[in-house]
Amino acid sequence: MIYSPTEQFEIKPLLTVNNMLTLSVNNYVMYVALVVTLMYSSVFLLNRTYLGFNRWGVALLAVYDTILNMVKSQMGARGGMYFPFMFTLFTFMLVANLVSMMPYSFAMSAQLVAIVSFSLSLWFGCVLMGLSKHGWGFFALFVPGGTPLALVPVLVLIETLSYSSRAISLGLRLSANVLSGHLLMLILGTLMFNLMGSSMLGFMGGFMPVMGVIAIVVTEFAIGMMQAYVFTILLSSYIKDSVYLH
């Protein structure tokens, strides 16, 4: 990773089975399993009797309450049935972004194809939900109320393009932010490392940007948490559109 800024984003096969089909276990699958394991381990290791009486319990309750209030504010009282899914999704994204901050780790959220495919499946699920609840009335979402008849074709086209772009923008926003932040950290860290190894003067000068790199790392932690929340709140907004048609 010292010589290639993009090496940390490469998917590498760890175990390959060649038969009629090529099956492989790669580092992406390994990190997905790691994130899921960390998610469920944190729940099982937390003693419910002491929930709220230690820092870990207070933090978990704060996250739980934040996502619950977000879902209720987006979808009202009927949104409670979607809360378990939204909380699980937020926790998965949050843990994945935090794990990717480990040195020499693998940035799952920076895999554009995987994240966009995931967001596409979520968007398609919202469309199916709207069709199952409202039938053909779901397409009333693309015609705002009070629209003059002459403008209906144009607005339907615009609304269709806007609604369809959600499938890509949902994952693209997350992936682009994580990718850019990790690249910036790696490039500045590599520059500082090479500068300190060049000469004694370079070694002394290499300490100057340390505070800047630390600030970027702290900012990237905040961005990882914020992007997990943004991903969740946008998806809850899309679900609200499918349920209430507005």
Swiss-Prot record:
Gene3D superfamilies given in the database record? ATP synthase, F0 complex, subunit A
Q: Predominant location of this chain?
A: mitochondrion
Q: Which residues form the propeptide?
A: 1-3
Q: Where in the cell is it found?
A: Mitochondrion inner membrane
Q: List keywords of the entry alphabetically.
A: ATP synthesis, CF(0), Hydrogen ion transport, Ion transport, Membrane, Mitochondrion, Mitochondrion inner membrane, Transmembrane, Transmembrane helix, Transport
Report TM segments.
25-45, 51-71, 79-99, 112-132, 138-158, 178-198, 203-223
Write one Gene Ontology MF term.
Answer: proton-transporting ATP synthase activity, rotational mechanism
* Membrane topology type: Multi-pass membrane protein
> Where is it found, in Gene Ontology cellular component terms?
mitochondrial inner membrane; proton-transporting ATP synthase complex
Q: Which InterPro entries match?
A: ATP_synth_F0_asu, ATP_synth_F0_asu_AS, ATP_synth_F0_asu_bact/mt, F0_ATP_A_sf
Write out the coiled-coil annotation as residue ranges: none
Role? Mitochondrial membrane ATP synthase (F(1)F(0) ATP synthase or Complex V) produces ATP from ADP in the presence of a proton gradient across the membrane which is generated by electron transport complexes of the respiratory chain. F-type ATPases consist of two structural domains, F(1) - containing the extramembraneous catalytic core and F(0) - containing the membrane proton channel, linked together by a central stalk and a peripheral stalk. During catalysis, ATP synthesis in the catalytic domain of F(1) is coupled via a rotary mechanism of the central stalk subunits to proton translocation.
Q: Subunit structure, briefly?
A: F-type ATPases have 2 components, CF(1) - the catalytic core - and CF(0) - the membrane proton channel. CF(1) has five subunits: alpha(3), beta(3), gamma(1), delta(1), epsilon(1). CF(0) has three main subunits: a, b and c.
Its family remark reads: Belongs to the ATPase A chain family.
User: Which protein is depicted?
Assistant: ATP synthase subunit a
